[in-house]
Amino acid sequence: MHLPNSQIYKNFGESMNPFDIMKASQIACCLEVSSFKPGNVHRNRDYRDIKYHHFINAGIAFGNVVYEAAQKDRDVGLYIKKAVIESKKWSPTNANLGIIMLHIPIAMAAGKLENFDENKLKENLKKIAENTTVEDALNVYDAINIAMAYVNKPKKGPDVTSEDAKKELIEKGLTLLDVYKISAEWDNISKEWVDNFKISFEGYNLLKKYYDELNNINLAVTKTFLNLLAKYPDTLIARKRGFETALKVSKMAEDVLNNFKEEKVKEFDKYLSKEGNKLNPGTTADLIASSLMIFILDRIDKRETILW
């Protein structure tokens, strides 16, 4: 007998339970990497040093930490570090540090909700950021080094690659939010923490809009990706190739979005990938993953978990 989703869910507990939050994170990771996002690894493209299946594996692997974090309201840095350790077991290089930095606080914030509520989720995220500690910052510095993430020497603030960085954090009493306020100048993941996940929620609302229009989650992700990339120059590209190059890529994304056709998207993808991953809009991909997690949490709450 076929039951509608609403009937199936009646036997389940509250929609914002830790298992659902874990599943939202894992499914978001899988949808993010599987959808066609120009310049990124996707189901039809690997990079030399990291392949499509590494992202799938790594995105699923830290689910147990998301489950734990969803039941906590402190130690966000510790759970980011634990998630990176789990993820790194399944990937030869950094697959999802940025995603983890976004998914763990979202999980903790969602864990305090009885039902999905965008405004309450924002309030909870704000509290998590404001209550971070020096210990959280120390753990995130460890996480970055474990992940072997691409980082430049910062213009100011402690250098995560320096042996004295953690000592400087302690001496100056810098919390994780303090550190993110410094790095927000050149990193949009850090800026999300400072701006209360503004881009992630913008992406969530774009996903809703495009999915309602297209009834195709992969196309909805592609259009959301292009929209965010057009509006917010990718900070990974900026760190690798300079801000002017990042601006140029954003302008190209806007042109593709305004003339949204399969061949245009593929041409853009070919252009961005012609130098390996030098023009990889990886920060924007991470923001898609956080937008997707929020989108899926909303769908779980509405008992609308089947996506086309």
Curated annotation (Swiss-Prot):
Task: Look up the domain of life of the source.
Answer: Archaea
Q: Which InterPro entries match?
A: CitG (IPR002736)
MF (Gene Ontology): ATP binding; triphosphoribosyl-dephospho-CoA synthase activity
Q: Name one Pfam family in it.
A: CitG
Query: What's the protein here called?
Result: Uncharacterized protein MJ0227
Species the sequence originates in? Methanocaldococcus jannaschii (strain ATCC 43067 / DSM 2661 / JAL-1 / JCM 10045 / NBRC 100440) (Methanococcus jannaschii)
Q: Taxonomic lineage per UniProt?
A: Archaea, Methanobacteriati, Methanobacteriota, Methanomada group, Methanococci
